[in-house]
Regions:
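Conserved ATP-driven motor cores of ASCE-family P-loop NTPases powering translocation/secretion/packaging/pilus
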Residues: 324-422
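P-loop NTPase motor domains
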Residues: 2-31, 36-40, 44-332, 378, ...
Length: 422
C-alpha cells in the first residue's frame, strides 16, 4: 500500500521574505541560494555559537547597506573586537575606549563631564545620572554601608554642582578635576562644597557640617568613611576617562564630529569602562526617545557582543529593551548580535528574565546561525511560531488501519537547527 505525504507537510521551495533596502546573499542548509533582506527601521537579533560568522556574514553587511542607503543616518557601534572600526571608521569619527594609545589621537573621544553637564537640558538631572552609574556597583553591594555610600554620591554631585553653578566659564577637564580631588583633604573638600549655597543642606545632613560654625566642626569616623567611598569612585577615573578633553555626546549628536561613534570595550579594563559606557549609551538612547529632541537624524545602533559587559556577574542595564520596543517611532534602529538568549539577561536589572523576554518583542527580525544551548533553541522555536502538523501512524499489524494524528509543533525543529553549519 502507498501513502502519500500530505501537502501541509511539504516545505515551500523558497522562503517568502519581504523586500528591503538591500539584501545579503546566503545559502540555506539544503543548499538553496537566497537573498536575505535588510529592512530599514526594523530591529534585528542575530544569534549563533562562536565562529559561525554572525558579525562578518550578516551584521557588518547589513550595517553597510543601511548606512550607504541613507547619508543622514548616524552610526553607533559597540564591539569587543575591531571589525566595525576596520570597516567603518573614517577621519572625523570618534572612538570611546579606555586605552588612549590604541586609537589615533584625532579619533579618540576624550570625555569632559563638566561640559557634558552644562550642555544638558537639566544639569541637575545630568549630575545625578552620572553619579548613579559611577556609584551603582558600590550601592548594589552596600548592605550596612549604604548610608555612607549615598553620602559619598551626594558629595560627588555637590562638587559637580559647585563647578557648574559657581564657575560658569570653566569646563574643567576630567584629569584636572579628578587629580585635584585626590589631593584635597576632607576639610578642603567641605570648604569647597560650602561655596555653593545649594550644598549647605547636604553638608549638614550627610556630614554634620554647619557652614555657619565651620571652625567648630570636628571630623568624625563618619566623615572619614564618606571620604573613603568617594575615593573609591575617583579611582575609577583612569585611561582616557582621566584625560583632559573637550568631547561630549551632545557635540556628536549635534554633528560636530564625524558620522559614526564607536564604543570599543576592552575586557582588560572592564571594571573601569563599564559605568562610563553605560552612561554614554543611555544618554544617546534618552536623547532619541525624548519628546524634546524634535526632528533629529536617525541612529543605527550596531551592537556586537554587548552582553560581554555583564561578565563577572555585573549587570549592564542602560535601557536596551526600552530602546528596542519604542525606538522605531523615534528613528532608532538596533542590530544586536549575541551567542545566547541567556546572555541577554544581564542587560536587564538584576538579570531579570521577564524584562529580557518581553524585550525580545522589540526584535521582529531574527537571524539564527547555529544555536548552541537549549534555552536559545526553545526561545527561537517559540518566536518562530508553531503550527498543526499531520503524522501518519502505521499499524503494528498488517491488518490494522493507519491513523492520522494532528499535533501542534514548532515550525522549526531541533533537527533543522542542528543542520545549520557550525
Amino acid at each position: 500500500m502507498f501513502y502519500d505525504i500530505p501537502a501541509t507537510m511539504k516545505k515551500e521551495e523558497a522562503p517568502q521574505w519581504p523586500e528591503g533596502v538591500g539584501s545579503i546573499q546566503a545559502t540555506l542548509p539544503d543548499g538553496m541560494a537566497v537573498e536575505v533582506p535588510v529592512l530599514k527601521g526594523t530591529n534585528v537579533l542575530t544569534l549563533g555559537v562562536v565562529g559561525t560568522g554572525k558579525t562578518k556574514s550578516f551584521t557588518e553587511n547589513a550595517a553597510d547597506i543601511l548606512l550607504s542607503g541613507d547619508p543622514d543616518i548616524k552610526g553607533v557601534f559597540f564591539e569587543v573586537k575591531h571589525s566595525f572600526m576596520d570597516r567603518f571608521l573614517v577621519n572625523n569619527d570618534k572612538v570611546l575606549t579606555y586605552d588612549s594609545e590604541a586609537i589615533p589621537e584625532k579619533n579618540l573621544f576624550v570625555p569632559n563631564m563638566i561640559k557634558e553637564i552644562r550642555q544638558a537640558n537639566d544639569s541637575e538631572a545630568e549630575m545625578r545620572e552620572l553619579a548613579d552609574f559611577l556609584f551603582a556597583e558600590l550601592l548594589n553591594g552596600a548592605n550596612q554601608n549604604r548610608a555612607w555610600i549615598q553620602a559619598a554620591r551626594n558629595t560627588f554631585i555637590g562638587i559637580l554642582r559647585t563647578i557648574v553653578d559657581c564657575f560658569p566659564g570653566e569646563n574643567t577637564g576630567n584629569g584636572t578635576l579628578i587629580h585635584a580631588l585626590r589631593r584635597m583633604t576632607t576639610g578642603e573638600i567641605l570648604a569647597y562644597l560650602a561655596k555653593n549655597p545649594r550644598n549647605h543642606s547636604m553638608l549638614l545632613k550627610d556630614w554634620g557640617y554647619d557652614v555657619h560654625y565651620a571652625e567648630e566642626f570636628k571630623f568624625t569616623r563618619r566623615a572619614y568613611d564618606i571620604q573613603f567611598f568617594l575615593n573609591q569612585v575617583l579611582e575609577n577615573f583612569s585611561g582616557s576617562f582621566a584625560m583632559n578633553g573637550t568631547d561630549t555626546i551632545h557635540d556628536w549628536l549635534a554633528g560636530k564630529y564625524g558620522r559614526n561613534l564607536f564604543f570599543r570595550y576592552d575586557l582588560a579594563s572592564a571594571e573601569i569602562s563599564r559605568p562610563f559606557f553605560l552612561y554614554y549609551m543611555k544618554k544617546i538612547k534618552d536623547y532619541k526617545l525624548s519628546n524634546t529632541a524634535g526632528t533629529s537624524a536617525p541612529i543605527l545602533m550596531v551592537l556586537d557582543e554587548l552582553d560581554k559587559m555583564t561578565d563577572g556577574g555585573k549587570t549592564a542595564d542602560w535601557g536596551l529593551f526600552q530602546a528596542a520596543n519604542l525606538g522605531r517611532e523615534y528613528g532608532l534602529q538596533i542590530l544586536l548580535t549575541t551567542q545566547s538568549v541567556s546572555n541577554l539577561y544581564g542587560l536587564s536589572t538584576d538579570f531579570n528574565e521577564h524584562i529580557t523576554s518581553g524585550g525580545l518583542a522589540g526584535f521582529p527580525y531574527l537571524v539564527s546561525f547555529r544555536p548552541g544551548d537549549p534555552e536559545t533553541i526553545s526561545t527561537l522555536q517559540t518566536l518562530y511560531g508553531s503550527d498543526y502538523r499531520e503524522h501518519i501512524i502505521f499499524p503494528a499489524s498488517r491488518y490494522g488501519e493507519p491513523t492520522v494524528r494532528c499535533e501542534m509543533e514548532p515550525l522549526v525543529t531541533e533537527v533543522e537547527f542542528a543542520s545549520l553549519e557550525p
